[in-house]
Amino acid sequence: MFWLKSGLFAVGLGMSFVYAIIPPLARDLGLSEIQASFIFSLSAVAWAMTSAPWGRASDKYGRRNIAILGYIGYSISMIILILPIYLADKNILSAAFVFPLLILGRTIYGLLGSATRPASFAYIADITPKSKRTKKFARFESNFLLGTLVGPLLGGYLYLISALAPFIFFSILGIVVAMGVFFTLENKPMKVSEIPTSKLSRLAPTVWPYLVFASVLSLCSASLLQSIGFYLTDNFNNLEDITLLISFTFVLLSISTIVSQNMFTSMFNLNNYKLLIYGCLILTISYCVMALSDSIATYFSSIILHGVGLGMVRPANSSGLSIAQQPEYQGEAAGHLGSVLPIGHILTPIVAMPLYIYNSSLLYFASGILCFILFVFIVFHPIFKYRYED
């Protein structure tokens, strides 16, 4: 378990740092907001296409082997992401190759890194009774969020030493985690008689409502993540150390999400239905405050509210999907969920960033409306109220 938790922590480190550093780097390289988003969107397409197959593969061949493959892909992608920028800066590589190579680095992450999450969460589902799964998922997810908290800070410090340093460090960390998982986690592939003869359909009544919820939430979250750097740069460029402000915003988001996840699943022990409806209402309010913010303090307050809402709905939705499935479909269910999580990053360059360019407030108001629609969807769809026993 330690190495699986460390794996999510390591992936969170790299992911949050990349989100924080790409917008200012894109500006320095002369890339537009849409080009910067496109770097992430192709990776998201690759992730969406491969997540469910990796989940099925973890059911068949074991959680450990598939998770290791994901860590290796993550490590490779971190190196490929920074290498073209470094070489172009040294006039070794033509600037014309930088954008395609950035896309390549993130695409590798999408193709292989997508194996980590379904394998890891399916392993947790394997060893956890249904009654404790929401709490367990929340605590497990907290390791990833802790990584997103530390990533911009640690990465920013290492970046002061060298542009290569944070990417090399995060890459090595991924390899170390892969080795730790290999030597400590027993691989238990299914017996031939246990392998399901049919696939778990995305359209199954116990699956599609959770996927719809995750898809809409993904669009709202991705549009925020990819616009934070640009929003602060465009609206508060009179403030000093804008890069530190961007990193601090991600830190606030991560801290509030971690605290929310552990508080509402452990201390208050709210059920999934309450977590979802309260969380959606808080997210709706956060986006409206964000759209109306005219000071950095107000914007930070909206980010904290957003983290609280995310901390409630994420573990509730993922555990709800897991609880509704039979044991032999845990990997595939986690894979289906993983396949829709990148939808936001796919659609953001097409839908969100053009809206942001037109008017950033409209983007956040639109996200608030979508979160309220999710609230209505949860209230009226019976599956979110249904309780599955162990």
What is each residue range found by the language model?
Residues 38-56, 248-260:
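Central cavity-lining transmembrane alpha-helices of secondary-active solute carriers
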Residues 105-144:
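Cytoplasmic helix-loop-helix junction between adjacent transmembrane helices
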Residues 50-63, 259-272, 356:
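Helix-to-loop junctions at the C-terminal end of transmembrane segments
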Residues 9, 92-115, 298-312:
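Hydrophobic core of transmembrane alpha-helices in multi-pass small-molecule transporters
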Residues 22, 115-128, 312-326:
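Intracellular juxtamembrane helix-capping segments at the cytosolic ends
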Residues 186-213:
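Juxtamembrane intracellular "pre-TM" segments in multi-pass secondary transporters
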Residues 72-95, 282-294:
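C-terminal ends and interior cores of transmembrane alpha-helices
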Residues 1-44, 209, 213, 218-237:
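Helix-loop boundary and gating motifs at the non-cytosolic
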